Amino acid sequence: MQTGVSYFSSRVLRHVRADLQDILEHGCTYVVHCFTETDLAYYRETMKGVVQATHDAGLEVWLDPWGLAGIFSGETFTRFPLDHPETWQVLSDGRRAPAACPNHPQTRAFLRGWVEACAAAGGDVLFWDEPHFYAGLWKGDMSGAWACRCDVCLGLFKDRFGYEMPAEFSNDAKAFRESSLLDLLAELCRSGHEKGLQNALCLLPTDLSAHGFPQPQERLRRALESRLGGAPPGAVDSMLHIGVGDFDTAASIPDLDIFGCDPYWYLFGTDAEKFMRVYGQAAAAAAGKRNRGLQMWVQAFSLPEGREDELRTGLRVAAQVGATHIAAWSYEATASMSSIRCPRPDLVWNIIGEEFRRLREL
């Protein structure tokens, strides 16, 4: 059992080294370092030092394209779309969204450059973190407009389906979005392997109702009815379709080594045991068919006070479904980020340490 935690707290090496010792003492075997666009622009050599310090501590280094191009998740900003406005995604209502289109050639060239930077830094694993098209729901946009209908996507859609892309969200639009992300990931994973890096993919839980969790969909529908007087056609489905729901196809990416998901039951307002088990079993089945490692994440941010012990439940279920890699987001219960830190970070971090040490003894 490999146990890890994400880290973005410092670029000052003496502080990083101290934190790495703390991470070791909490039972971790790997660290998921966020390698952002800020790092690409200003901290490339510094990141080499961070990677080396992590290796010196005896920990494996995973590198996360945190927030890159607005395609991968992360509480950080992206500059690439500002520098390349021609890559912006276009919403179904004609508005332009400040995130780069995964299908645009310049976006792909930029992301391949990130892979090269990770190889130069000496990383071990590329962690492809929740790839998705622009998610208006995350920005408070309740219109139901979805991406992407840029010229590149319109052309690719017509080539594949033989007709013009509809403005209303449909099964074909959903399939196109997923296949676009998977095609991008296949290209990036191939690039990673060519440079001697492993690849790990983490997908968000999606298709919630089909997996037995109708609550988020119903909450969103009620919110739209309250705010707009009703949900526009396809709005609920488009707003909740974030990422890739086809686990089997995702796990089949040829150059993928580790497949997983992050069933954050607090975030989705669901039961810890059931949510982790349902999505964990789905991820395990997909990973098992392709002989991939299985990674499961638990939420150590925005964790409600008084529910900290549910982490023990989530980690226990992750082990039961056969996870080879378990991780928590993020270091010290995200204490350094005030907007999403846990109310009692010390308690959360201690629970993670206790459970990680226990899991490694199994």
Model regions: which residues?
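Glycoside hydrolase catalytic-domain groove-lining segments
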Residues: 62, 162-305, 314
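Active-site-proximal loop/short-helix segments
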Residues: 128-169, 206-215
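Active-site beta-loop-alpha junctions enriched in small/polar residues
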Residues: 7-11, 36-38, 66-70, 131-133, ...
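Catalytic domains of carbohydrate-active enzymes, especially glycoside hydrolases
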Residues: 9-40, 120-125, 250-259, 317-326
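Substrate-binding cleft of secreted/luminal carbohydrate-active enzymes
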Residues: 256, 261-270, 295-360
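Active-site-adjacent "subsite" loops/lids of carbohydrate-active enzymes
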Residues: 60-121, 157, 161, 165-173, ...
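Hydrophobic faces of well-ordered beta-strands that scaffold small-molecule active sites
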Residues: 3-7, 31-33, 61-65, 126-128, ...
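Aromatic-lined substrate-binding rim segments of carbohydrate-active enzymes
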Residues: 19-82, 169-193
